[in-house]
């Protein structure tokens, strides 16, 4: 389907059309009439089809809240109330790419598949996850994905771990075998990433 500037289509208005010889295709930018959301449509003959919903997320501080939200919204939604839809999709879909990414200024949720129906299914799950996440009803999701205190852990572990300048308080149980430790999916992911010397070289 060839689109022309100012053409109306399913609640969108075509703003620009540009030939892209590098990918033997055409790029279209459309604006959603009601919300103002922008849609970039790349048309070419590639058998692999992709979809992504993305948001500008410039941070106000270094708490990593957008990275935590990226993980949190993929922990169930109104339409798909399963604990880990992302993991289920990895196992059951014909996807060729499935991920979510937080950059310094944006957060993206891209998917790809060579099967048209599979792509629509993936887009349906991702759109519901992003627009209707279970995090609104289950605060524990945010705490699980971000950071939280847990009683337990290795007493030999470092006592100096910190988040937002707050040192972890070391406590022991009555038998002296456990202490209060920080845990969380994104917390541990970033701790691992930032402990790699190559990340700062």
What role is predicted for each listed range?
Residues 2-46:
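N- or domain-start disorder-to-order transition segments that initiate the globular core
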Residues 3-6, 94-95, 161, 166:
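Generic N-terminal segment detector
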Residues 20, 30-31, 43, 89, ...:
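A general structural signal for short secondary-structure junctions and capping/turn motifs
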Residues 25, 43-128, 132-140, 195-197:
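M16/MPP (pitrilysin/insulinase) zinc-metallopeptidase core fold and M16-derived inactive scaffolds
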Residues 37-38, 93-94, 187-188:
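Short alpha-helical segments and helix-capping/turn motifs at coil-helix boundaries
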Residues 138-148:
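Short, glycine/acidic-rich hinge or "gate" loops at secondary-structure transitions
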């Amino acid at each position: 389907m060839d689109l022309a500037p100012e053409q109306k289509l399913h609640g969108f208005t075509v703003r620009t059309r540009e030939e892209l010889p590098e990918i033997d295709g055409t790029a279209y930018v459309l604006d959603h009439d009601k919300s103002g959301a922008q849609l970039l449509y790349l048309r070419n003959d590639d058998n692999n089809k992709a979809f992504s919903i993305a948001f500008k997320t410039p941070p106000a501080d270094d708490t990593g809240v957008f990275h935590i939200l990226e993980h949190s919204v993929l922990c169930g939604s109104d339409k798909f109330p399963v604990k880990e839809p992302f993991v289920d999709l990895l196992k059951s879909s014909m996807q060729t790419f499935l991920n979510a990414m937080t950059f310094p200024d944006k957060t993206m949720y891209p998917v790809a598949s060579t099967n048209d129906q599979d792509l629509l299914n993936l887009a349906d799950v991702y759109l519901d996850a992003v627009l209707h996440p279970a995090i609104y009803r289950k605060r524990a999701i945010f705490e699980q994905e971000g950071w939280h205190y847990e009683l337990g852990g290795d007493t030999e572990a470092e006592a100096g771990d910190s988040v937002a300048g707050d040192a972890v308080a070391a406590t022991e149980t009555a038998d002296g075998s456990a202490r209060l430790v920080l845990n969380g999916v994104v917390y541990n992911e970033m701790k691992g990433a930032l402990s790699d010397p190559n990340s700062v070289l």
